[in-house]
Amino acid sequence: MPVLIESIGNLERRLTFSVPEDRLESHVDERLREIARTARINGFRAGKVPAKVIGQRFGEKVRAEVLDSLLRETLDSAIRAHSLRLAGAARIDHANEGGLNFVATFEVVPDFGEIDVSKLGVVRRTAKVTDVDIDQMIENLRLQRRTWRVAEHGAQVGYLVALETWSQAGDERLPIEGVEAGSTILGSGVMFEQIERGLEGLSKGDENVLDVTFPDDWRVMQLAGKAVQVHVKVIEVSEPVLLEVNEEFIKSFGVKSGKLEDFRADIRANLERELKGALVSHLRREVGEQLIAAYAHVEMPPRLVEKEARLMLAKQIEQIRLSGRDPTGIPDDAHIGFMDAACKRVLVGLLVGEIAGRNRLRLDPMRVTETLHLIASTYEEPEEVFQMYRNDPKLMEGVQSLVMEEQVIEWIADRAQKTEQVLSFQEAIQQ
């Protein structure tokens, strides 16, 4: 039968086609003959099994495998012949039960018309890792491994304060009876800023009453938006003891030489990797937002958007589960809340693919290798991780997709109207 294409929606198509029976039977016979040459069945010598026995033993499975292969080959040929560009996988059903006529339903990529990226305005950030950033990271590492000793003087920023508190908000006392025990490192922001400031200079046994006004969105509902008297009593004040940056300290971070220059070089490499990731992520968001603004009027394939929304919901459910919470109360239609974000993500993805195709952008294998080395360098056995990625098609597909997207994003940014924004390392990674 001839291939029949029908439009059943703005972006949905139905394609009716058939697999030639003579071609199917020819391929099945050929495959069964291949099996017969090596098949081992009890009672027969290898390669001497009768064709009838081979057909009885393997015929049904082989026919299903060959039909699936020919079905997809025939469908792909029809799609190419009619210049159809699919947005997602096709759903294939039998047109007649048990026959060789099939119906494929799928969505197509929308027509974006002319794509002129030179009209887009992109803010491109730049930043560098400096010696000051490396010094700060070393200080952070020292802080991570600090110990504490009882202080003989009042609390300062960076000191650990153990305390008891109770609050009076109008006629309401919190807690109703007794006190709440807790601790905070001054300047860490664990407690409300006004409370931490009120603890500065206090020593063990000191008490104070602090007049605090909590913001409307404060996490404790009874205190939110209220002027409160917070009664504090200091139980203990401890000062930090920082380790010396010596050979032992440096080796504890995997720097075998124990030398400071090697330690700083490792830190610089890590910070530069973090910075690159932050700059690339920002550029991806920046270009994505500009593409969304310019092409928001283009209709997106509804089934593809719904699929993306369900994937986003599934990811959130997994995050809830990993955090130890129970996601079973989430309703079945919760994906609807992700539809807007999913539509934008699909729009950017299709546009990136369209731009790559129209401009014949090709995946840079050298960049893929560099990305693999970058990923592997974050592990203790980088060469093993590198080879693991190289030998796993799914992992490689993910890396290649990421690299291709980065290439297209940079291609767009290079041709858009650019505004350069120079930031410090800290500004770049925090925004």
Swiss-Prot record:
GO terms for molecular function: peptidyl-prolyl cis-trans isomerase activity; protein folding chaperone; ribosome binding. Its EC number is 5.2.1.8. It holds the Pfam family Trigger_N. GO terms for biological process: 'de novo' cotranslational protein folding; cell division; chaperone-mediated protein folding; protein transport; protein unfolding. InterPro entries: PPIase_dom_sf, Trig_fac, Trigger_fac_C, Trigger_fac_C_sf, Trigger_fac_ribosome-bd_bac, Trigger_fac_ribosome-bd_sf, Trigger_fact/SurA_dom_sf. Gene3D superfamilies: 3.10.50.40, Trigger factor ribosome-binding domain (3.30.70.1050), Trigger factor, C-terminal domain (1.10.3120.10). Residues 158-243 form the PPIase FKBP-type domain. Its main location: cytoplasm. Keywords: Cell cycle, Cell division, Chaperone, Cytoplasm, Isomerase, Rotamase. GO terms for cellular component: cytoplasm. It is found in: Cytoplasm. It catalyses: [protein]-peptidylproline (omega=180) = [protein]-peptidylproline (omega=0). Involved in protein export. Acts as a chaperone by maintaining the newly synthesized protein in an open conformation. Functions as a peptidyl-prolyl cis-trans isomerase. Belongs to the FKBP-type PPIase family. Tig subfamily. This is Trigger factor.
